[in-house]
């Protein structure tokens, strides 16, 4: 057995072992409901027995956020900025019903939005591909990663109802009249009632989006496609196209060529058609609305939101946050509270840990940690692919709804733990 094998083969069931030392802290963001239950089990079964790691813990449960007036979320984001890597459990974004359920002081904002606003960066969603699990788009053999520019556009737009006939104008007033001219743009002459909307974006945000996208393409060694409708929105979408091209030519072209990958702009309608026809294996950089829609299409096309990871990457590539792309699995949590059996898919939550640890290992130049993260992913996938052990959602995706076809939440994690020990032991 190699030195790496001896270092990796550590479990609470063994009398003697040497854990892998994680050089720098990792920020752990705990969450809500069923995912919180799973999160704790993953940490105790699959992480802490193998790693000597300083976890900077932040409880982002909705009760904790309410008790701290959401300061805990801001503190967690600042900690990620300080240490470089955060690993996040799924959290509740309260609506009116949740405010009443938890007796909250107010309807707190999405923790993900708060963290993203503090860190900046781009959210990328990547499917976890298991050949055994049927895909609604059978041709998709390799992951399709969706990068969503979650800033501005329709999501920060000002919209209004037009009550009747009149003229609509768009007015720009420069803060410093010596640097730019005021502009008044005629939008439409209404003959009757209607609707109107004005939206925006910034060069700074688009440029950051470009850097995050190019860096991920280099890291993953995948082709990158920016998709817009610049033939219609010649200035608005054209600005995205121009900034991406400028950033690519100035800073990334030579590296792309060295790796044998390429960058290309394509019209969104053409790209979506090509995506369906393709075998996968590329990154799509999309504007806010397009990214919102396409990420869910890709998730369903690959089989399940339970097999989708989400990472936040900053433009400088030095700050990274990983989490599962799904929610807190409330329905299963209600069953858990009643003491009933649950069969909750923990794969995306396991991958939140593995992707964060992999990034920590890369930043700290710790090959053993990177190796462990990869083995953890392999063990998780092989539990399903080779051992045929899966949770109910995956069994149903395979067309089998018999009780014997799936295991409980706890049994699946036990199976992954067993497979992890087996794969570590097999390292020569």
Swiss-Prot record:
Q: What does this protein do?
A: Mitochondrial IDP1 may regulate flux through the tricarboxylic acid cycle and respiration. Its probably critical function is the production of NADPH.
User: Gene3D superfamilies annotated for this entry?
Assistant: Isopropylmalate Dehydrogenase
* Mechanisms controlling activity: The enzyme is subject to end product inhibition by NADPH and 2-oxoglutarate.
Query: Where Mn(2+) is bound, by residue?
Result: 269, 292
Site, as annotated: Critical for catalysis: 155, 229
Just give the chief location class: mitochondrion
Cofactor notes: Binds 1 Mg(2+) or Mn(2+) ion per subunit.
Record has Ion transport as a keyword: no
Query: What species does this protein belong to?
Result: Saccharomyces cerevisiae (strain ATCC 204508 / S288c)
What protein am I looking at? Isocitrate dehydrogenase [NADP], mitochondrial
Its assembly, as annotated, is: Homodimer.
What family is reported? Belongs to the isocitrate and isopropylmalate dehydrogenases family.
């Amino acid at each position: 057995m190699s030195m790496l094998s001896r270092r990796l083969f550590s479990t609470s069931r063994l009398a003697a072992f040497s854990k892998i030392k994680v050089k720098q802290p990792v920020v752990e963001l705990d969450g809500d409901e069923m995912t919180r239950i799973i999160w704790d089990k993953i940490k105790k079964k699959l992480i802490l027995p193998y790693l000597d790691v300083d976890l900077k813990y932040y409880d982002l449960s909705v009760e904790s956020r309410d008790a701290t007036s959401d300061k805990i979320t801001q503190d967690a984001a600042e900690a990620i900025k300080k240490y470089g890597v955060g690993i996040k459990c799924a959290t509740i974004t309260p609506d009116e019903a949740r405010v009443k359920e938890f007796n909250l002081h107010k309807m707190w904002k999405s923790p993900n939005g708060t963290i993203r606003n503090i860190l900046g960066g781009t959210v990328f969603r990547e499917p976890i591909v298991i050949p055994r699990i049927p895909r609604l788009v059978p041709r998709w053999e390799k992951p399709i990663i969706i990068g969503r520019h979650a800033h501005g556009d329709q999501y920060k737009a000002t919209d209004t109802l037009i009550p009747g006939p009149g003229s609509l104008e768009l007015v720009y007033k420069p803060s410093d009249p010596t640097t730019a001219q005021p502009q008044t743009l005629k939008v439409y002459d209404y003959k009757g009632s209607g609707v109107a909307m004005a939206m925006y974006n910034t060069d700074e945000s688009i440029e950051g989006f470009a850097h995050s996208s190019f860096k991920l393409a280099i890291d993953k060694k995948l082709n990158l496609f920016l998709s817009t409708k610049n033939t219609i929105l010649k200035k608005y979408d054209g600005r995205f196209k121009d900034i991406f091209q400028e950033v690519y030519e100035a800073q990334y072209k030579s590296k792309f060529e060295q790796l044998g990958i390429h960058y290309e702009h394509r019209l969104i309608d053409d790209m979506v058609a090509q995506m369906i026809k393709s075998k996968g294996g590329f990154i799509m950089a999309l504007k806010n609305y397009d990214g919102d829609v396409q990420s869910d299409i890709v998730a369903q096309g690959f089989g399940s939101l339970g097999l989708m990871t989400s990472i936040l990457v900053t433009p400088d590539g030095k700050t990274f946050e990983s989490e599962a792309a799904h929610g807190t699995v409330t329905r299963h949590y209600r069953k858990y509270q009643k003491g009933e059996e649950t069969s909750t898919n923990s794969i995306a939550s396991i991958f939140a840990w593995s992707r964060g640890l992999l990034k920590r290992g890369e930043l700290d130049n710790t090959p053993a940690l990177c190796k462990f993260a990869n083995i953890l992913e392999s063990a998780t996938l092989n539990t399903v692919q080779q051992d045929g052990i899966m949770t109910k959602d995956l069994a149903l995706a395979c067309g089998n709804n018999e009780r014997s076809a799936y295991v409980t939440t706890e049994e699946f994690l036990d199976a992954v733990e067993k497979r992890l020990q087996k794969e570590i032991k097999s390292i020569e």
